[in-house]
Amino acid sequence: MLTVDDVLEQVGEFGWFQKQTFLILCLLSAAFAPIYVGIVFLAFTPDHRCRSPGVAELSRRCGWSLAEELNYTVPGPGPESQCLRYEVDWNQSTLGCLDPLASLATNGSPLPLGPCEQGWVYDTPGSSIVTEFNLVCDDSWKVDLFQSCVNLGFFLGSLGVGYIADRFGRKVCLLATTLTCASLGVLTAVAPDYTSLLIFRLLQGLVSKGSWTAGYTLITEFVGLGYRRTVAILYQMAFTVGLVLLSGLAYILPHWRWLQLAVSLPIFLLLFRFWFVPESPRWLLSQKRNTEAIKIMDHIAQKNGKLPPADLKMLSLEEDVTEKLSPSFIDLFRTPNLRKYTFILMYLWFTSSVVYQGLIMHVGATGGNLYLDFLYSALVEFPAGFIILVTIDRFGRRYPLATSNLAAGLACFLMIFIPHDLPWLNIMVACVGRMGITIVFQMVCLVNAELFPTFIRNLGMMVCSSLCDLGGVLTPFLVFRLMEVWQGSPLILFAALGLVAGGMTLLLPETKGVTLPETIEDAENLQRKAKPKENKIYLQVQTSELNTQAAERDASQGTAQQK
């Protein structure tokens, strides 16, 4: 029986059509990077001190350098220098230029300190939401809330957007979420106050991850089996390209509103090209829209300069006797193997997020060059993608994924015992952990897409990856609260999560060389060592034997297994 993969073998598994579509969708993947980690530049916190009226004039009159001004007018080092000020009238004429506060101190008692009632002075040539809305000192938690809103949006949007993609199609989801994401990005850039900023970021989080995931699912369903893993990994590496470009763009545009506009407006241009990207033929077949699927397969053949199979058009004339498959959350937990896949993938996504972001927070707390530090951390992800491309065909998915989890967990465990006077060793081990968890992040997307049947593939991706977003919401609190107990406490948590994830990965089936499952039965059979042609996505109808088995099963259970 003819399958989608059989047709692609004849018309081109990765021809001109797939290459063109892949490059377009990679632009979407790169555009998602500023939404996910743009907080680094949008909300950076520069050195700051209380604004005290009269200090600037006194400094000019006395000819002080910046270091002298800070020494004379700002309280000692630590939080006091950023959140408190001397309660002194700096405009009084009796103040001298040499130790001006000496004459005000009586009996050697310290001068009274007060809050920053006049705002703050920030040592930066640019701006961020921190400097514009004064999100420092008692209001510093609002920066964490700003980032949590994005991750909360990812989490909430995972469920609804995933259902839309499986119910109404990948293309409809892609167009709707991309348009909404771009519009909300522009609204964020012109937000008049902090409250509206939170609302726009939350709403953008609701749709932006769905847009990225719809593109990921679409491109993996367009290509043949031999190229599926390659395009999946390269699609994620396009995200890393977005990280690199973001660091350069942020350096050129140090003002957050201009930077936000610069990363949002180009998304509108992608919409014009997305309009000409066809719907996934695999999804159309799962919805029993065979005629449309065959037209798209014929279009792919024409674009690739190949002739479609001679029996392709005959398939649309055969009677469609199968039942239309509609996505349901229950399907993710309906059968034993699918239930196991869902829970394990949820844990893997959660672990990936906590360890990935946690390592950045724990190691990246050193005050270096913001742009270079971000660039170096992004470049580490390119070797991770290369390692996947080299190993995934030789060793499959399961063992590299398990090994990467174990490597990340072991690296975090070793960092606990590295002395503080060996920072270079700490950075090297941390890079190994970062590379390992990056490999996990990239591979779990591929494995997630390969384990679920077509009609719930996008839903399965969104539901499982929603745990990644939940981890993103919790990670700042986990890291900083545990560091208050002991600086190495977060590393113990990261090590435990990574090592357990490595063991749980071995419970998943190997999907190397196995075609994408169409039905729940196909997904259940992945656990068995099936022949290469056993699990296929059919262009026409399922065999009468499967229909008979399904009818007998439905009759015995009293309910339909699938809508």
Curated annotation (Swiss-Prot):
A GO cellular-component term linked to this record: apical plasma membrane
Activity regulation summary: Phosphorylation of the transporter leads to changes in its substrate affinity, resulting in a regulation of the transport activity. In contrast with rat ortholog, ASP uptake is inhibited by protein kinase A (PKA) and C (PKC) activation. ASP uptake is also endogenously activated by calmodulin, the calmodulin-dependent kinase II and LCK tyrosine kinase. Inhibited by cGMP, most likely through a cGMP-binding protein that interacts with OCT1.
Entry comment, domain topic: A large substrate binding region with partially overlapping binding domains for structurally different substrates is formed by several transmembrane helix domains (TMH) including TMH 2, 4, 10 and 11, and it is alternatingly exposed to the extracellular or intracellular side during substrate transport. Contains one proline-rich sequence (Pro-Glu-Ser-Pro-Arg) that is required for transport activity.
Taxonomy, superkingdom: Eukaryota
Phosphoserine sites (modified residues): 328
Modification comment: Phosphorylated.
Protein name: Solute carrier family 22 member 1
Localization (cell): Basolateral cell membrane; Apical cell membrane; Lateral cell membrane; Basal cell membrane
InterPro entries linked to this entry: MFS_dom, MFS_sugar_transport-like, MFS_trans_sf, Orgcat_transp/SVOP, Sugar_transporter_CS
Glycosylated residues in this chain: 71
Ranges per topology, Extracellular: 43-144, 193-196, 254-257, 364-371, 419-423, 481-487
Chief subcellular location: membrane
Family statement drawn from the similarity comment of this UniProt entry: Belongs to the major facilitator (TC 2.A.1) superfamily. Organic cation transporter (TC 2.A.1.19) family.
Pfam families (alphabetical): Sugar_tr
Gene: SLC22A1
Motif (Proline-rich sequence): 278-282
